[in-house]
């Protein structure tokens, strides 16, 4: 039986899928190997590797100009790669051909529409282009417009807000039931309410498709993503499940808060490793002073401790660490 699992693991690696616990495989919906792209003398992608598991919500993180949009346009076959390979649902992407795009729904950062149409008219138009039947177009359009909160919207698209256009763009991208939904900076120009609406929709469609969205808004990623990748200087430095990455980079730093400033001063006089971080708060590393020593002193001296907790790594701290290396 052990030999069987070993063989399955080898096959999974060969065909860009992930080994599952029961000896089956979980497919990588998107697999990129050694992707390279140059514009003149400027090298934008320098051997990028990326694996996006099926039914994940995958955050593709990078600062402006890092190459996120270039990567996405290459996945769509709109840009010709200078090297490397891209597989979508196991099929190779070829520049200038659209075969693999039948698996993909795409939402650009600024979607464009025919302003004189209503939302149902626009989805009907898109459905006819893709060869859907009229019955399927009507059923799917109603389903998606309800999903994105536009089910009762009768106005023409020209009066839509930016957030409404983004939501319509998601509906259009999902119309043909794609296996992979690619969103390029979908929340970058939205207000907090609009951002929440888009993020809620992306989270809701996870059971239907795999979501890859690029962003530099790290709080959005922490809110909905199951997996992430950090793009910096043309390569992916870190990628994997968000929970695993946070666990891997967990520190031994703690923060505590006292009821009074005088109580914090007393603690800092006794424990030299405490560093003040606020009016009544201080941080420390466990190897400087154990939790037991501090808690015993707090108890013995009747210090009112409001909280003491481990400092969990944030995506911001991890990303800055990657960028500054």
Named regions from a protein language model:
Residues 4-5, 15:
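Short, low-complexity segments with poor structural confidence in diverse proteins
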Residues 8, 32:
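Conserved catalytic Walker-motif region of ABC-type ATPase nucleotide-binding domains
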Residues 12-26:
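Short, Lys/Arg-enriched N-terminal segments with co-localized hydrophobic residues
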Residues 28-30, 37-232, 238:
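ABC transporter nucleotide-binding domains
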Residues 197-285:
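ABC transporter nucleotide-binding domain
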Residues 252-325:
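Short, charged/small-residue-rich alpha-helical element at the C-terminal edge
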């Amino acid at each position: 039986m052990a030999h069987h699992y070993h063989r399955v693991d080898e096959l999974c690696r060969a065909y860009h899928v992930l080994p599952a616990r029961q000896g089956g495989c979980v497919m990588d919906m998107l697999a990129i190997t050694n992707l390279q792209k140059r514009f003149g003398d400027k090298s934008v992608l320098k051997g990028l590797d990326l694996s996006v598991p099926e039914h994940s919500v995958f955050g593709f993180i990078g600062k402006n100009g890092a190459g996120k949009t270039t990567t996405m346009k290459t996945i769509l076959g709109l840009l010709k790669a200078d090297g490397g390979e891209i597989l979508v649902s196991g099929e190779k992407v070829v520049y200038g051909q659209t075969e693999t795009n039948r698996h993909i729904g795409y939402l650009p950062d600024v979607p464009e529409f025919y302003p004189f149409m209503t939302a149902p008219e626009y989805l009907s138009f898109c459905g006819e282009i893709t060869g859907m039947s009229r019955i399927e177009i009507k059923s799917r359009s109603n389903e998606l417009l309800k999903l994105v909160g536009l089910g009762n919207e009768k106005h023409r698209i020209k009066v839509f807000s930016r957030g409404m256009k983004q939501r319509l763009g998601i509906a259009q991208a999902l119309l043909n039931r794609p296996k992979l939904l690619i969103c390029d900076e979908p929340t970058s120009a939205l207000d907090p309410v609009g951002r929440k609406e888009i993020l809620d929709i992306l989270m809701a469609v996870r059971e239907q498709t795999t979501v890859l969205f690029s962003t530099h808004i790290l709080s959005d990623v922490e809110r909905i993503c199951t997996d992430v990748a950090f793009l910096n200087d043309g390569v992916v430095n870190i990628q994997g499940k968000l929970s695993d990455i946070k666990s891997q980079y967990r520190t031994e730093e703690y923060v505590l808060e006292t009821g009074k400033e005088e109580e914090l001063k007393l603690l800092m006089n006794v424990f030299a490793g405490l560093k003040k971080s606020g009016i009544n708060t201080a941080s420390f590393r466990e190897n400087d002073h154990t939790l037991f020593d501090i808690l015993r002193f707090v108890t013995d001296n009747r210090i009112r401790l409001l909280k003491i907790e481990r400092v969990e790594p944030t995506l911001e701290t991890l990303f800055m660490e990657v960028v500054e290396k």
